């Protein structure tokens, strides 16, 4: 039975996780498809560019990665302290690099909040702060983007990934090194 990601990822126990995303329908993530001869190597650039953006936005540090022909591996570190130390302005600035910020939050940030907007804006900023340190949101922002680009390029719709990403807690330095060597 599938467990909720919140039951699988506990930054208090360990901040390090090995995450894996795998393609479906014999789709190619990167490299050359021997059957069609089509080269998908440029997709690695998409992934690296997106990972660079996510490193600037999230408080999740990328320790290692490997991009294979039909899947990828990431070793990440959830930096909870960094998320907690961000100012409200920094949270909004980071969040707005990936998502639209409601006008109400912009008004609040500029000091022009209407009655009742301040509490709602502060609740949204608190939610965004949590999400900036959430592996599921990090992976969502990576996988959705890559799937849309690949589907657009392939001229198709539907799933690009084999389902939810896989994640494994890395409990000690030995495990961390083993994942990074892979």
Predicted regions mapped to residue ranges:
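Short catalytic/metal-binding and nucleic-acid-binding patches
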Residues: 1-182
């Amino acid at each position: 039975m599938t467990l909720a990601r919140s039951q699988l990822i506990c930054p208090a126990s360990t901040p390090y996780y090995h995450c894996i995303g795998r393609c479906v329908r014999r789709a190619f993530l990167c490299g050359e498809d021997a059957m069609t001869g089509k080269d998908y190597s440029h997709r690695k650039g998409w992934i690296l560019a997106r990972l660079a953006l996510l490193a600037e936005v999230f408080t999740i540090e990328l320790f290692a990665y490997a991009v294979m022909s039909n899947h990828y591996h990431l070793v990440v570190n959830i930096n909870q302290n960094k998320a907690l130390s961000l100012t409200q302005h920094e949270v909004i600035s980071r969040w707005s690099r990936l998502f639209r910020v409601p006008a109400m939050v912009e008004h609040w940030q500029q000091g022009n909040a209407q009655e009742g907007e301040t509490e709602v804006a502060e609740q949204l900023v608190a939610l965004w702060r949590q999400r900036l340190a959430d592996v599921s949101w990090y992976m969502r922002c990576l996988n959705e983007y890559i799937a849309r680009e690949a589907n657009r390029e392939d001229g198709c719709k539907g799933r690009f990934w084999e389902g939810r990403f896989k994640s494994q807690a890395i409990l000690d330095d030995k495990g961390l090194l083993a994942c990074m060597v892979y």
